Amino acid sequence: MSLKIRLARAGAKKRPYYHIVIADSRSPRDGRFIEKVGAYNPMLPSDHADRVRLVNERITHWLSQGALPTDRVARFLGNAGLAPKPAYTEQPKKSAPKKRAQERAAAAAAAAA
């Protein structure tokens, strides 16, 4: 059984609220879980104390048992100091226009001037 520490959506339509749960990776997102270990309320301001709440002892227990956090939960755990922060991956840069497109742009600029 592969355990994940992940978000389970709760709350009303257009008012998201997430429970941070320990669940089997094969179970549905909002389905059966083993234990609730925190909560995440994205509607609160990012500096609000209750935006992310974690039960530190239980999370460290499940991490020692081999549970793997999802990407978003790994960021929460990294910010709380419970796990190493995930590596920041830079977004790829948009490639420069090819030679022919640059020539067309230069010709259009010259025609406009």
Curated annotation (Swiss-Prot):
Q: Which GO terms describe its cellular component?
A: cytoplasm; small ribosomal subunit
What Gene Ontology terms describe what this protein does at the molecular function level? structural constituent of ribosome
Q: Which GO terms describe its biological process?
A: translation
User: Would the keyword Ribosomal protein be found if you checked this record's keyword annotation?
Assistant: yes
Q: NCBIfam families annotated for this entry?
A: S16 (TIGR00002)
Q: Which family does it belong to?
A: Belongs to the bacterial ribosomal protein bS16 family.
Report what the protein is called. Answer: Small ribosomal subunit protein bS16
